């Protein structure tokens, strides 16, 4: 869950997370509430750091009338992944819709 109010804080949080996994020799999947829309600086920076967006354009917020996408699953390395299926599940257990994805990774 990245910061809800401050974009600079979200950018720093995303940088910390992506730096943490940068040297991993294993495939990595991260996900959650990034509190940022697809064209935001923070999402563009994540993509520029070679993460792959493993979700479709499903709108996830607010759960009762989804209007924006701010929840994501990202995978690294950027290549070799395939989405078998993904969906936002309609539920009011949270203010966000959960995303369920089945991914396949083929090591190159």
Where are these regions (language model features)?
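Active-site regions of metal-assisted phosphoester/phosphodiester hydrolases
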Residues: 1-108
């Amino acid at each position: 869950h990245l910061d809800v109010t401050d974009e600079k804080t979200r950018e720093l949080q995303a940088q910390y997370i992506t730096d943490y996994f940068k040297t991993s020799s294993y495939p990595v999947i991260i996900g959650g509430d990034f509190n940022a829309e697809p064209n935001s600086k923070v999402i563009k920076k994540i993509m520029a750091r070679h993460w792959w967006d493993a979700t479709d354009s499903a709108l996830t917020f607010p759960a009762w009338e989804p209007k924006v996408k701010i929840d994501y699953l990202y995978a690294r390395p950027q290549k070799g992944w395939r989405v078998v299926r993904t969906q936002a599940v309609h539920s009011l257990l949270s203010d966000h819709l959960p995303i369920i994805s089945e991914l396949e990774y083929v090591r190159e």
